[in-house]
Amino acid sequence: MEPEVKIERRKTRQVMVGNVPVGGDAPISVQSMTNSETCDVDATVGQIRRLQDAGVDIVRVSVPSMEAAEAFGKIRKQVDVPLVADIHYDYKIALAVAEQGVDCLRINPGNIGREDRIKAVIQCAKDKGLPIRIGVNAGSLEKELQRKYGEPTSDALVESALRHADILDRYDFQNFKVSVKASNVFMTLQAYRKLSSQLEQPLHLGVTEAGTFRSGTVKSAVALGALLMEGIGDTIRVSLAADPVEEVRVGFDILKSLNLRKKGVNIIACPSCSRQNFDVIKTVNELEARLEDINESVDLAVIGCLVNGPGEAREVDVGLTGGTPNNLAYRDGEKSHHITADDLVDELERMVRAKVKKQREDEEKGIIARSE
């Protein structure tokens, strides 16, 4: 078997967003953002709980008004995931939401205003022990930088970030992370590469306004994947014009593809052709939906014929090779038993869940053994 490639990550300071470490040697965390009206407490709480079910590490909530800041406090009491307050324009909202149990304040250098306002936010964050994210966006750069560069560029994004990092540094505040997002993949890549060589703070990766589910997934996978392979990035958010739960799924899939996080069922499936002995696409789609609740790492291969099936099945936890008259199942790389086409989904689900149960039992035994 090909040896697993280990990505050497850039060493950064570590900050804590609630109970989730970001930076240092911490696992790369996956974030998402609610798209409900924050003042609709029930809707926002419901969405956050769905994100938690999907495995999200950190959730950002827009706080556009004092009313939203008050609603944030009610939301905070009903969920137990770290929450970031997304603040634009009015620094006083940041001060207000800091009293409501927030875990991190995101400010936008392009619209937060004068240095005295930033100083007030810094002092508040110090008093409350909160980290700050300097969130630079190509679409909302400071007017001065817009005039200087004429249009958004990677240099403009980096200059904005470094200016505000310098402000935080002058007020002896190091508990922050930074993002420099653009909707253009190349601008995003260049900005993060330049910034990573000039700051020791953790970097929050993302392609802003990436697009629809399909196009946004592609852009994010290309940009974030390239940066992560270079060891750049400590937390990610995949921005999609879609259900926020999809952002979490795509985020984890990006990390899983690079062996940076192990979570959930990794389905390996052929694209299918006329050699398939069962409906591969229908089978894997149904399996993916049924196995969404699993957080343990399990590799499942579903291959429609004998060309590549045995080779793939021998490398995974649970495998299936299409055959005539019946399909052959593999368990831990060894041939196990035959399955008819009608029983494929039920039997593969049973095998995966049995594997998960065994993993949990082995982990429990290990914990008991270590405690003795």
Swiss-Prot record:
<dbReference type="InterPro" id="IPR011005">
    <property type="entry name" value="Dihydropteroate_synth-like_sf"/>
</dbReference>
<feature type="binding site">
    <location>
        <position position="270"/>
    </location>
    <ligand>
        <name>[4Fe-4S] cluster</name>
    </ligand>
</feature>
<keyword id="KW-0004">4Fe-4S</keyword>
<keyword id="KW-0411">Iron-sulfur</keyword>
<keyword id="KW-0479">Metal-binding</keyword>
<feature type="binding site">
    <location>
        <position position="273"/>
    </location>
    <ligand>
        <name>[4Fe-4S] cluster</name>
    </ligand>
</feature>
<comment type="pathway">
    <text>Isoprenoid biosynthesis; isopentenyl diphosphate biosynthesis via DXP pathway; isopentenyl diphosphate from 1-deoxy-D-xylulose 5-phosphate: step 5/6.</text>
</comment>
<protein>
    <recommendedName>
        <fullName>4-hydroxy-3-methylbut-2-en-1-yl diphosphate synthase (flavodoxin)</fullName>
        <ecNumber>1.17.7.3</ecNumber>
    </recommendedName>
</protein>
<dbReference type="InterPro" id="IPR004588">
    <property type="entry name" value="IspG_bac-typ"/>
</dbReference>
<keyword id="KW-0414">Isoprene biosynthesis</keyword>
<dbReference type="GO" id="GO:0019288">
    <property type="term" value="P:isopentenyl diphosphate biosynthetic process, methylerythritol 4-phosphate pathway"/>
</dbReference>
<keyword id="KW-0560">Oxidoreductase</keyword>
<feature type="binding site">
    <location>
        <position position="312"/>
    </location>
    <ligand>
        <name>[4Fe-4S] cluster</name>
    </ligand>
</feature>
<feature type="binding site">
    <location>
        <position position="305"/>
    </location>
    <ligand>
        <name>[4Fe-4S] cluster</name>
    </ligand>
</feature>
<dbReference type="GO" id="GO:0016114">
    <property type="term" value="P:terpenoid biosynthetic process"/>
</dbReference>
<dbReference type="Pfam" id="PF04551">
    <property type="entry name" value="GcpE"/>
</dbReference>
<dbReference type="GO" id="GO:0005506">
    <property type="term" value="F:iron ion binding"/>
</dbReference>
<dbReference type="GO" id="GO:0141197">
    <property type="term" value="F:4-hydroxy-3-methylbut-2-enyl-diphosphate synthase activity (flavodoxin)"/>
</dbReference>
<comment type="function">
    <text>Converts 2C-methyl-D-erythritol 2,4-cyclodiphosphate (ME-2,4cPP) into 1-hydroxy-2-methyl-2-(E)-butenyl 4-diphosphate.</text>
</comment>
<dbReference type="GO" id="GO:0046429">
    <property type="term" value="F:4-hydroxy-3-methylbut-2-en-1-yl diphosphate synthase activity (ferredoxin)"/>
</dbReference>
<comment type="similarity">
    <text>Belongs to the IspG family.</text>
</comment>
<keyword id="KW-0408">Iron</keyword>
<dbReference type="InterPro" id="IPR045854">
    <property type="entry name" value="NO2/SO3_Rdtase_4Fe4S_sf"/>
</dbReference>
<dbReference type="InterPro" id="IPR016425">
    <property type="entry name" value="IspG_bac"/>
</dbReference>
<dbReference type="GO" id="GO:0051539">
    <property type="term" value="F:4 iron, 4 sulfur cluster binding"/>
</dbReference>
